Amino acid sequence: MAKDDVIEVEGTVIETLPNAMFRVELENGHTVLAHVSGKIRMHFIRILPGDRVTVELSPYDLTRGRITYRYK
C-alpha cells in the first residue's frame, strides 16, 4: 500500500489503552483504535485523553489508525 492511499482525519483522544494504544473519537462521530507512529514514540511526545490528534486510516480497515500528530 502506498502512503498516498491513507485517509487523514482529526479527532480527540477519549481513552488511553495498554501498549501505546488509544481510543480516538473522530470529527464525524466514529470511534477508532489508534496506535502511535514511530516519530511520536521516538521523540517521547505524551498523548493524554482530551488531546486533539491527526489520525491516518487505511482504506482497508477504517476501525484502526495511526496517530501522526498531536496538536498543541
UniProtKB/Swiss-Prot annotation:
**Does the keyword rRNA-binding belong to this entry?**
yes
- This one is known as Translation initiation factor IF-1
Signal peptide (from-to): none
Organism of provenance: Geobacillus kaustophilus (strain HTA426)
Per the database entry, which stretches of residues form a coiled coil?
none
Q: Which GO terms describe its molecular function?
A: ribosome binding; rRNA binding; translation initiation factor activity
Give the modified residues of type Phosphotyrosine. 60
Q: Which Pfam families match?
A: eIF-1a
Q: Summarize the subunit comment.
A: Component of the 30S ribosomal translation pre-initiation complex which assembles on the 30S ribosome in the order IF-2 and IF-3, IF-1 and N-formylmethionyl-tRNA(fMet); mRNA recruitment can occur at any time during PIC assembly.
Recorded name of the encoding gene = infA
Q: Which family does the similarity line name?
A: Belongs to the IF-1 family.
User: What domain of life does the UniProt record list for this protein's source?
Assistant: Bacteria
Q: What does this protein do?
A: One of the essential components for the initiation of protein synthesis. Stabilizes the binding of IF-2 and IF-3 on the 30S subunit to which N-formylmethionyl-tRNA(fMet) subsequently binds. Helps modulate mRNA selection, yielding the 30S pre-initiation complex (PIC). Upon addition of the 50S ribosomal subunit IF-1, IF-2 and IF-3 are released leaving the mature 70S translation initiation complex.
Annotated Gene Ontology cellular components are: cytosol
Q: Does the keyword rRNA-binding apply?
A: yes
According to the entry, every stretch annotated as the S1-like domain falls at 1-72
